[in-house]
């Protein structure tokens, strides 16, 4: 009976040991599952951390953005500089074109025509001095002594001939003389004939 009870206890003990072993196995499996779960979570956390830190590990992209913006700014500034240069060039061209505009006829300064009415023979020298200075002179001999007027015209005619000047008659007693550099045109009697120079002869009946 005692042995039977002992056997029963042993069987119960054995049964308890098996249950304990099963429990231990169950706990071990749970721990293994927890460990694997923890490892997977850690791996996921590591992956997430890598994903979070990945943009910060790309300085090239973050630096390229300001580079592109700076390139845009430089392009904009370059275009504005080009516009300024083109405007300045057009202004220079306008100034050059304005400076190249030349009037068709420039007024000749210094050209002078003197009107002389001699009262003596000495005035003929003053008339010749005007011719030497490159000025034209109008000689009015009206009311002057005819013989004296002829002497004056003889003197002036010699000066005109020696200087290769021009002598023209406007009326019977009005003449105009000019140096070779001054041309005179108009409706008058030319005292220089085609065959040479002729000294004017005044009307004795004046």
UniProtKB/Swiss-Prot annotation:
Compositional bias annotation for Basic and acidic residues: 31-53
Protein name per Swiss-Prot or TrEMBL: Cell division protein SepF
Record bears the keyword Oxidoreductase: no
InterPro entries: Cell_div_SepF (IPR023052), Cell_div_SepF/SepF-rel (IPR007561), SepF-like_sf (IPR038594)
Alphabetized HAMAP family for the sequence: SepF
Pfam families: SepF
Compositional bias segments (type: Low complexity): 60-80
Superkingdom of this protein's organism: Bacteria
GO biological process terms, semicolon-separated: division septum assembly; FtsZ-dependent cytokinesis
Gene that this sequence comes from: sepF
Keywords attached to this entry: Cell cycle, Cell division, Cytoplasm, Septation
Region (Disordered): 31-81
UniProt family annotation: Belongs to the SepF family.
GO cellular component terms, semicolon-separated: cytoplasm
Subunit structure: Homodimer. Interacts with FtsZ.
Subcellular compartments: Cytoplasm
Function: Cell division protein that is part of the divisome complex and is recruited early to the Z-ring. Probably stimulates Z-ring formation, perhaps through the cross-linking of FtsZ protofilaments. Its function overlaps with FtsA.
């Amino acid at each position: 009976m005692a042995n039977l009870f002992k056997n029963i206890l042993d069987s119960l003990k054995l049964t308890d040991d098996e249950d304990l072993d099963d429990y231990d196995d169950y706990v071990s499996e749970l721990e293994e599952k927890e460990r694997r779960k923890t490892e997977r979570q850690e791996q996921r956390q590591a992956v997430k951390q890598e994903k979070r830190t990945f943009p910060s590990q790309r300085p090239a992209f973050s630096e390229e953005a300001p580079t592109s913006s700076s390139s845009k700014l430089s392009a904009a500034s370059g275009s504005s500089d080009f516009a300024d240069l083109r405007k300045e060039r057009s202004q220079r061209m306008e100034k050059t074109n304005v400076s190249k505009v030349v009037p068709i006829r420039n007024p000749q300064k210094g050209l002078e025509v003197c009107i002389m009415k001699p009262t003596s023979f000495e005035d003929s020298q003053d008339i010749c001095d005007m011719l030497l200075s490159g000025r034209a002179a109008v000689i009015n001999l009206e009311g002057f002594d005819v013989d004296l007027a002829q002497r004056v015209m003889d003197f002036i005619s010699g000066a005109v001939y020696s200087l290769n000047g021009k002598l023209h008659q406007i009326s019977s007693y009005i003449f105009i003389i000019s140096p070779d550099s001054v041309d005179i045109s108009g409706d008058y009697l030319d005292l220089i004939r085609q065959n040479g120079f002729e000294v004017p002869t005044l009307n004795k009946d004046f």
